[in-house]
Regions:
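Acidic, surface-exposed loops and disordered segments
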Residues: 1-118
Length: 118
């Protein structure tokens, strides 16, 4: 059932707007798998790239993105991870979700100071 079909499923206060809806749970069917990009298509990976970075990239590739576009990129710069949104619809919002998945997969925090809450 869609959130739009359920009366009072959500509340939007004055001055707020609904940016996106992320569904959680299990569907009636398993759906269909979508093609995913390869880690090398979204990150700079070399022979000496640490395993935690590769794990983070692989987790980021599992993150939900608008229209399954996976429009983002990661790069390791010394001890810092750089993440960039690509072009596409909602790619800036997708980047926040992707960064979270990267941190879960890598087991390390990199983007905590970048997160801002209104």
């Amino acid at each position: 059932m869609s959130y739009a079909k359920v009366k009072n499923a959500y509340t939007i206060a004055k001055g707020e707007k609904l940016c996106c809806v992320i569904s959680l749970g299990y569907g009636k069917t398993h759906g269909t798998p979508h093609k995913s990009k390869l880690p090398e298509e979204v990150a700079v990976i070399k022979d000496d790239t640490p395993e935690w970075f590769i794990n983070g990239v692989n987790a980021a590739l599992l993150a939900p993105t608008a229209m399954n576009q996976q429009s983002f990129g990661f790069m390791l710069d010394g001890d810092k991870v750089l993440a960039k949104a690509g072009k596409g619809i909602l790619s800036d919002m997708d980047l926040g979700i992707v960064k979270y998945h990267f941190e879960i997969g890598s087991g390390k925090e990199f983007f905590k100071d970048e997160m801002k809450f209104a």
